[in-house]
C-alpha cells in the first residue's frame, strides 16, 4: 500500500513538472529514450493523419517517409532491436549496436532534410 502512495506522489510530481516546464527531470536523465518514445508515436500519427504534404513529395511518398523515420526511431531502441531483430539474443552486442547506428544515421538524415516539413 505504501509503495502505491509513493508511486502516486512521484507520478504527480512528474506531471506538475511537465505542466510547468514542458518536461520532467526524469526526461532529461534519459533524454534519448524520452525522445524516441515521444517522437515515434508522433511521427506514426502524422503519417496516418496529416492534412497536407510538402510539394516535393506525393502523399504516398510523404507517408512512407514519415513511417520510415518512425521505424528508424523504433530500431534506435536497443530493446526493440534485441527482441524483434535478434530473437532475444542479448549477447549479440556488436550486431545490435550496428543496427542501432544504421537507424540513427538514417533517421537524422531524413529528419534534417524534412525538419521544416513536419507540420500538419
Name each model feature, range by range.
Residues 1-120:
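Long, non-globular targeting/processing and low-complexity regions
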Amino acid at each position: 500500500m505504501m509503495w502505491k502512495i509513493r508511486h502516486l506522489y512521484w507520478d504527480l510530481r512528474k506531471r506538475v513538472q511537465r505542466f510547468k516546464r514542458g518536461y520532467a527531470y526524469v526526461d532529461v536523465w534519459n533524454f534519448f529514450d524520452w525522445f524516441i518514445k515521444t517522437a515515434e508515436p508522433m511521427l506514426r500519427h502524422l503519417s496516418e493523419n496529416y492534412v497536407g504534404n510538402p510539394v516535393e513529395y506525393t502523399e504516398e511518398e510523404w507517408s512512407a517517409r514519415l513511417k520510415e523515420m518512425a521505424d528508424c526511431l523504433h530500431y534506435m531502441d536497443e530493446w526493440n532491436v534485441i527482441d524483434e531483430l535478434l530473437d532475444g539474443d542479448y549477447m549479440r552486442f556488436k550486431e545490435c549496436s550496428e543496427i542501432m547506428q544504421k537507424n540513427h544515421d538514417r533517421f537524422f538524415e531524413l529528419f534534417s532534410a524534412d525538419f521544416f516539413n513536419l507540420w500538419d
